[in-house]
From Swiss-Prot:
GO terms for cellular component: cytoplasm; ribonuclease H2 complex. This is Ribonuclease HII. Transmembrane segments: none annotated. Endonuclease that specifically degrades the RNA of RNA-DNA hybrids.
Amino acid sequence: MEAIPAIGLICGVDEAGRGPLAGSVVAAAVILDPARPIDGLNDSKKLTERARERLAPLIRERAIAWAVAEASVEEIDRLNILHATMLAMQRAVAALGCVPDLVRVDGNRCPPLAVPAEAVVRGDATVPAIAAASILAKTVRDAQMIALDGEYPAYGFASHKGYPTPEHFIALRRHGVVACHRRSFAPVRELLDNPELWPAGTLT
């Protein structure tokens, strides 16, 4: 992990949920406190669920500021997933409650922001504040998908979190598209465009 630059408040930003076929895309923004370090920060995808659940409350407790925001399924379908992700990131930074001196965003592009920003490829594995943001975004989105599993128990959202797994494809073919599915994503759109693929009585 990189050391935290001594140039003021550094905000890390990352997202969770760009690839799934269902659910919102979630972004988090975190300003870490150098005086209150957190051991074990890493890209959320490299951590176990147990580790993420242990670290998330520590991040909330020790960070100078943090915020989580999202873009809805409807916004994803209207804007496309890239622009919806940028919107969620903008909302997270705006919700911090303080103005960072620099925003560092995981990936190769930044959303339009009113403060200086830079994109950091693989930043979730090299920049502590981005790693912290990735953990918050991932844990919040996972909790949302577990809640959706209670609403739509036939789809297995608690296990695959909306990603295009074989289990999810089988559920789509068997039960059809529901409100939380992203209609602009190709596998979902294919079902909508081909009613003969739907189970009887499920097309809405």
